[in-house]
Amino acid sequence: MANIKSNEKRLRQNIKRNLNNKGQKTKLKTNVKNFHKEINLDNLGNVYSQADRLARKGIISTNRARRLKSRNVAVLNKTQVTAVEGK
């Protein structure tokens, strides 16, 4: 790339944004793992809000956020059904 000030600034911005986006995705993965460790509505709410926030910012696609939420709700419903059947 040519040594143009605007290109150098753009490169700095891209690096900073890339690091921020990676951190946000890591937080989402951590929230999903925490949900799977202890399945409850509080953890599901964290996953929902994080996924919606990242989709709104364009860090993940809206379809990916919807898919993630749908799969986690299915896990929650499955555990609730087995808990009721076990009683």
UniProtKB/Swiss-Prot annotation:
UniProt organism field: Mycoplasma pneumoniae (strain ATCC 29342 / M129 / Subtype 1)
Keyword presence, rRNA-binding: yes
Function: Binds directly to 16S ribosomal RNA.
One function term, GO molecular function aspect: structural constituent of ribosome
Keyword Ribosomal protein: yes
GO cellular component terms, semicolon-separated: ribonucleoprotein complex; ribosome
Full protein name: Small ribosomal subunit protein bS20
Record InterPro entries: Ribosomal_bS20 (IPR002583), Ribosomal_bS20_sf (IPR036510)
GO biological process: one example: translation
Keywords associated with the record: Ribonucleoprotein, Ribosomal protein, RNA-binding, rRNA-binding
